């Protein structure tokens, strides 16, 4: 059946065009290619613009709106890990120098699968300063860093301050310097004096910036 149809088609092509089937289909393919090239020359430049605009509008309709930043206040490092992007219902947070920023709008970078996803849900100050992706550098501790690394960290902080909303701080145990205790003055002014008692006399040696004085008092 198929052979009979092909034979009939060959005879029709030869009868109407005088060409063999191979030549006929080759000429047909060339004509289509030439048509595509010529039609591209006369295409309106606004067609591509309109096409891109339609694609962009469709993409915006598919993406859910970014929620407004929510203040989380002072939280611990463990609590910050809940905002690493694994839960799409929660904001995407990241901290620099104990300051927490909402980076939800840059989920393509800091969300799961992004190039900086390792930093999400953490205070990765040291890793940002060193541009390191090692697990040991995912910490707020920047001790031992050089001036160039600290400058790089400062640049990151300025970028986050200008681009993202600050929503809280990280409470880290031991991150604050200890406050030196100040002793209260005593009411007895002779507390700082060194008193030495010898038979028949009492020697009181007062320490001061001035030359030391020795007071002798005979025992009554």
From Swiss-Prot:
InterPro entries given in the database record: Cyt_B5-like_heme/steroid-bd, Cyt_B5-like_heme/steroid_sf, MAPR/NEUFC/NENF-like
Induction pattern: Not induced by phytohormones and strongly suppressed in darkness.
Domain Cytochrome b5 heme-binding intervals: 74-171
Alphabetically ordered keywords of this record: Cell membrane, Endosome, Lipid-binding, Membrane, Signal-anchor, Steroid-binding, Transmembrane, Transmembrane helix
Transmembrane segments: 22-42
Coiled coil: none
Stretches with biased composition (Polar residues): 178-200
One cellular component (GO) term of this entry: plasma membrane
Similarity annotation: Belongs to the cytochrome b5 family. MAPR subfamily.
Free-text domain note: The cytochrome b5 heme-binding domain lacks the conserved iron-binding His residues at positions 109 and 133.
Subunit-level organization: Interacts with BAK1 (via extracellular region).
Name this protein carries in UniProt: Membrane steroid-binding protein 1
């Amino acid at each position: 059946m198929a052979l009979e149809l092909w034979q009939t088609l060959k005879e029709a092509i030869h009868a109407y065009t005088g060409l063999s089937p191979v030549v006929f289909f080759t000429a047909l393919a060339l004509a289509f290619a030439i048509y595509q090239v010529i039609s591209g020359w006369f295409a309106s430049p606004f067609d591509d613009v309109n096409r891109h605009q339609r694609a962009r509008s469709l993409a915006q309709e598919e993406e859910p709106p970014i929620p407004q930043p929510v203040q989380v206040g002072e939280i611990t490092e463990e609590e910050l890990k809940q905002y690493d992007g694994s839960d799409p219902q929660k904001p995407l947070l990241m901290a620099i120098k104990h300051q927490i920023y909402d980076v939800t709008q840059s989920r393509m970078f800091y969300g799961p699968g992004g190039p900086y996803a390792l930093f999400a849900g953490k205070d990765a100050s040291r890793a940002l300063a060193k541009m390191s992706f090692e697990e040991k550098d995912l910490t707020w501790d920047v001790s031992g860093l050089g001036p160039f690394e600290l400058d790089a960290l400062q640049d990151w902080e300025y970028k986050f301050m200008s681009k993202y909303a600050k929503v809280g701080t990280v409470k880290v145990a031991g991150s604050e310097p200890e406050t030196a205790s100040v002793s209260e003055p005593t009411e007895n002014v002779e507390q700082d004096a060194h008193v030495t008692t010898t038979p028949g006399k009492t020697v009181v040696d007062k320490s001061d910036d001035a030359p030391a004085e020795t007071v002798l008092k005979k025992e009554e």
